Design a protein with these regions (language model features):
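Active-site catalytic microenvironments for nucleophilic, acid-base chemistry
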Residues: 24-28, 134, 216
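Short, glycine/serine-rich, charged loops/turns that create anion-binding
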Residues: 39, 63, 153-154
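N-terminal Rossmann-like FAD-binding beta1-loop-alpha1 element of flavoenzymes
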Residues: 6-34
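Rossmann-like flavin
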Residues: 95-215
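Glycine-rich helix-loop-beta junction characteristic of Rossmann-like nucleotide cofactor-binding loops
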Residues: 2-3
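Glycine-rich FAD pyrophosphate-binding loop
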Residues: 27-50
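Hydrophobic/aromatic ligand-binding patch that stacks against planar heteroaromatic rings
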Residues: 20, 24, 55, 164
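Glycine-rich active-site loop/strand segments that organize a redox cofactor
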Residues: 46-119, 139
Length: 217
């Protein structure tokens, strides 16, 4: 069987994954067409990489199959300030997915996911840095790390995250209340502790980064 030669590639969606994959393919001499309902260079662009938090988070290895998430779901659903929303008329269609999700909410699956997420994410910042060398990231990217803070009420959940990341060798620094306030003096002294991930980056303008990368095509 002869070696397959790719003549061209079509990519659906010009979010951060789409444009980064497209750029790498173009560098290999493969013509690329990206399909999206919006023009990336227009002000009407509304893809997944528009208006999000914009964190480059190589530490984010724990996903939603963590063992303690089920205890938080009811509170998140019924709180008007919660991060989770559900269209109840769509709920019956989600039963199969939800049962599969429940099956994977166990320690073994959680650690399996975290292990392989770490293998991918540990390469992500270096991969982005290669691209950032080719664009002007002034006012687009901040390299200040990220701080998570919590109260004693949330301590059990945070201990789980810290242990899993520590076991995987992820660089993190635990903070006392005093150290949290030294780093973020505008916070009220209601948080008991925190952790800082100094290798994390933040996109000040995710849409601007997308446009800058796309202009390399």
């Amino acid at each position: 069987m002869g070696k397959y030669k790719c003549k061209s590639v079509g990519i659906i969606g010009c979010g951060i994954q789409g444009v980064c994959i497209g750029l790498q393919l173009i560098k290999k001499g493969i013509p690329v067409t990206i399909f999206d309902r919006y023009d990336l260079l227009s002000s009407e662009f509304q893809s997944a990489s528009y208006g999000n938090a914009g964190h480059f988070s190589p530490y984010a290895v724990l996903q939603f199959n963590r063992t303690d998430i089920l205890y938080d779901v009811p509170k998140m659903l019924f709180s008007s300030y919660g991060p989770l929303a559900l269209k109840w008329n769509y709920a019956p269609k989600m039963i199969s997915w939800f049962l599969h999700h429940l099956k994977n909410c166990n320690k073994k699956s959680m650690l399996h996911t975290a292990k392989y997420m770490h293998q991918i994410l540990s390469l992500s910042n270096d991969a982005y840095e290669e691209i950032f060398k080719e664009i002007d990231t002034t006012n687009l990217v901040e390299k200040k790390g990220i701080i998570y803070v919590w109260t004693k009420q949330n301590l059990k959940s945070r201990k789980l995250e810290i242990k899993v990341r520590n076991d995987l060798g992820i660089e993190q620094k635990l903070l006392t209340q005093r150290e949290v306030l030294e780093l973020e003096p505008n916070l009220k002294p209601v948080f008991d502790a925190g952790v800082v991930y100094e290798g994390a980056m933040h996109a000040r303008n995710p849409h601007g980064i997308l446009q800058a990368i796309f202009k390399l095509f």
